[in-house]
């Protein structure tokens, strides 16, 4: 089945390439323009459960931008209790408390990643971000709205709140593969993390390109395993450490 999984990855990435380029370019342009407003402007990334890896993917990454503020509340991550994280993912009330821990400013952008786009916390994150004057980019699977209901009190999905929506082209239920044998039917091998990571890096690549077109030097981290990287990276950390909580 390992080759079948790779085939599913390829098919989904090709679908992203065929259908989502305009939305990805719009998201990158929106974020790039927001980064030009102030010397220390950043953009923010948020996700619950496994989607929190989206925030980690862009944070403090070799070849990645330094102006990324990941929102990483332990309540919504798995390492302090998987069941607890699922409970809080459906809880709207926790978002304001979480956002109050971070420096979120008007006219900045936040990327919110939620495969289903149906749970209370990521939807409320979009609502609260817009209330605070941020622009919201959502990465989600649009299949869910067609097949299930929202768990947010508004009855809305994440895609209904966001300013720009990028469909990760993932399946309902996330699992890419299925096997039927006798009475057994099992779905397995999730895709969403792979697809979200592809989209996030496409966005970031386009942001870097936009900055270069404007004759700006993108604040990109070097790998800590190459010579000369430490001095370069420390300068970027010094520039953004007051804005990026987890630096």
Curated annotation (Swiss-Prot):
Record GO biological process: carbohydrate derivative metabolic process
Signal peptide: none
Domain SIS: 31-213
Record GO terms (molecular function): carbohydrate derivative binding
CDD domains per UniProt: SIS_RpiR
Pfam families: SIS_2 (PF13580)
Family: Belongs to the UPF0309 family.
Descriptive protein name: UPF0309 protein Teth39_1980
């Amino acid at each position: 089945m390992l080759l079948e999984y790779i085939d599913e990855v390829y098919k989904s990435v090709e679908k992203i390439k065929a259908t989502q380029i305009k939305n990805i370019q719009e998201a990158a342009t929106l974020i790039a323009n927001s980064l030009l407003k102030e010397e220390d402007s950043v953009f923010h990334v948020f996700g619950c459960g496994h989607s929190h890896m989206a925030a980690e993917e862009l944070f403090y990454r070799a070849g990645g931008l330094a102006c990324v503020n990941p929102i990483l509340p332990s309540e919504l991550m798995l390492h302090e209790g998987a069941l607890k994280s699922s409970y809080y993912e459906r809880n709207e009330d926790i978002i304001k408390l979480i956002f109050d821990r971070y420096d979120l400013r008007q006219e900045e952008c936040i990327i919110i990643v939620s495969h289903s786009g149906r749970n209370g916390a990521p939807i409320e994150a979009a609502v609260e971000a817009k209330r605070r004057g941020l622009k919201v980019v959502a990465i989600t699977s649009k299949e869910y709205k067609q097949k299930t209901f929202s768990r947010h009190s508004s009855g809305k999905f994440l895609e209904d709140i966001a300013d720009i929506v990028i469909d990760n082209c993932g399946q309902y239920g996330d699992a890419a593969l299925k096997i039927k044998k006798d009475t057994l039917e099992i779905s397995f091998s999730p895709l969403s993390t792979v697809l979200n990571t592809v989209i996030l890096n496409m966005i970031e690549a386009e942001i870097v390109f936009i900055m270069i077109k404007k004759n700006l030097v993108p604040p990109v981290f070097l790998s800590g395993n190459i010579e000369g990287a430490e001095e370069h990276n420390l300068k970027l950390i010094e520039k953004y450490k007051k804005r990026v909580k987890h630096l």
